[in-house]
Amino acid sequence: MVKVQKPQPKSLNKSASIEGVVKKKGKPEKTKKLATDATLELASNKKAKNAAPVKKDAIKKEPEVSKKGAEKKQSKAAKRPLILAPPESPAAPAPAAKKSKAKPAASGAPVGKKIEAKKPLILAPPESPVPPKKQEKKTKAAPVKAKKEPAPAKKSVQDPVPSIKKVPAAKKSGQTAALTKKTAKTEKQAAPAKPAKAQPASQLQKKAKAVQKLSKPASPPKSKKALSKSKPGQAKGNAVNKEPAKSKKPVELTFELKAFDEKRFHEIVNENNVTKVCAALKSVVSEEVEKKKNTSIFSDYRYVLQVCSYKIPSCPKRMVKLNLKHSLVGKDDDVALIVPDLQRGAKFDYDPTKQHYEDMLREAGVKQRLTVVPFNQLRNEMGSFEAKRKFLNSYDYLLCDGRLSGQATAFLGKNTQKPRNVLHSLRLSKDNDKLPQEVTRALTRTAFRQLSKGDLIAVPVGNHEITAEQLAENILLVIKQLQEVYPGGLANIRSMYLKIDITGTSALPLYVSMCAPPEDVPYVVGPREQRMLKLKKQANEVLSKFAMTKDAEFIKLTSDQVKRKAQLRKEKAALLAADAAPKDNDGGDAAVPAKKARKESSSEGAKADAESDEEEEVEEAEDSAGESGDEDEEGHDGDDTDEDEDEDDDDDNEDGDDDEDEDDDEEDDDEEDDDDDDDEE
């Protein structure tokens, strides 16, 4: 398809661009129309702005409008600058409202006059400079006429009139007139919305007062006042400032706390007082348990001794086991006994081992009902965590052969670290006569967990079937053992309370200490640390029989050298004690150096001595080795006694050499002592 352009618009418009010509032709026509329309609109706007004051003048000068119709055009044009000022005065909205009342009050004739006045106003723009002078004279004469007398009844219209006359007296410049025109628009638009509120100022003030009286009891103003008086930020600040004023000062002790007295402790915690407390607790607990029988499934419970300490000890985590006089196990309680297998291995059946130990207990005359559990059965059936926990919770008391106690606790896990689930060990020996005693001893035991976190421990001391006297005996035996086992001893005990292991029950005090707490934090050496210290001591004893050369080779010392080394140690310790004694007895306030500084100073001197002693010791060892080799070649026996005799003869002949050797040995011993001390530190 071929596109064809129409040539007619190009030939008609006589221009290079069709669209441009059309737009150019349209623009002048629109501008002309806009110019004429704009003039009309501007004129109408000016009329609308000046309509209100014109109407006021029309109301005042009704007879003049009727007589002189031709002069109205000129008079209105002349009054424009005088009428533009009132909109800025505060009384400007009042006259706008009065127009609405003036309209119904006037007759039909003035309304017609107003309409006639609007028509000639459209032709107002062409103004001549000559008529305004004549109009100004007329305006000056206008207030002289003051035709307010024909309408005396219209007080609402006449009262605010003088305020309007006073405002035009102050004439403003052309710049202020432009601003008043803009403000006049907004005021005149709002004026027709308030026709009914046009009232004198006195009445408006009265109404405003009445509104204020009604608004006083309302709640919103109260809230505002409260907010203005006290802001939320200020209120918080005041509250914070008042808190320290209210807080009481710490109570200062005016007396000194006495040190712990063990005799006084035993006077308070005696058998008579403990039995009274136990009897009172049993009577109180029986009532509380009856109330809680509906909620709890089991009726059995245990008595617990709660011990609170002054200072939390530094001790390893472990289960401490104590002996009791009367067993915690009741008649109907279930007790499990973990025993080793007769044949080790997961494939072997564990029924023969079970039958073997049951027969052995029956023959020995053990009266307590025990459930034998071979360790092979434990490994096969209790593999998961839930199964292990269920096994431990299904028994009231757990016994284990001493050969398996460590292995069984490691297998069952952390659930055995509770006083109720602890594995109490016993010895299953072949002697049937001692087996019942061993079982009763294992059943009369209790345990508590020792920690380095809290200051409270709970020790089970009895069950619900036990009497008050038996409970008191168990408590006294436990307190006697706590004196040795508890970290810090009895002096570190703040209080002791007796209660049962059911939550929500009461507790009775056995002992409350008012003594001064211990100065030092108690430190407990656990069984593992004791074993390590024992091994260290043995290692030091073995190393004391050897000496090290420069080439890092150990040389074994003779028996005489070891003895001499031990004597030198004792002498050295005595000298150190003698040096330290006068310093302590001086009584002066001399500053004692820190432990670290003392160690450094002593170690520096020891190192210097050690270097010289090591060289001499190595030379001696080499010389002694060479002498022994020569003697063997000559045919003498290699016994130590012969060597000692030869050495003694040589010492008699050569006193100087002997003295040197002794000095060397002493220096060697000093070096070894220093080395041992460093190792121990």
Curated annotation (Swiss-Prot):
Residues carrying Phosphoserine: 15, 17, 89, 128
Superkingdom in the source lineage: Eukaryota
Compositional bias ranges of the Low complexity kind: 103-112, 189-217
Region (Disordered): 1-248, 579-681
Alphabetized InterPro entries for the sequence: Ribosomal_L1-TF (IPR053110), Ribosomal_uL1-like (IPR023674), Ribosomal_uL1/biogenesis (IPR028364)
CDD domains linked to this entry: Ribosomal_L1
Biased composition (Acidic residues): 611-681
Record's keyword annotation contains Ubl conjugation: no
The protein's name in its UniProt record: Ribosomal L1 domain-containing protein CG13096
Originating organism: Drosophila melanogaster
Taxonomic lineage: Eukaryota, Metazoa, Ecdysozoa, Arthropoda, Hexapoda
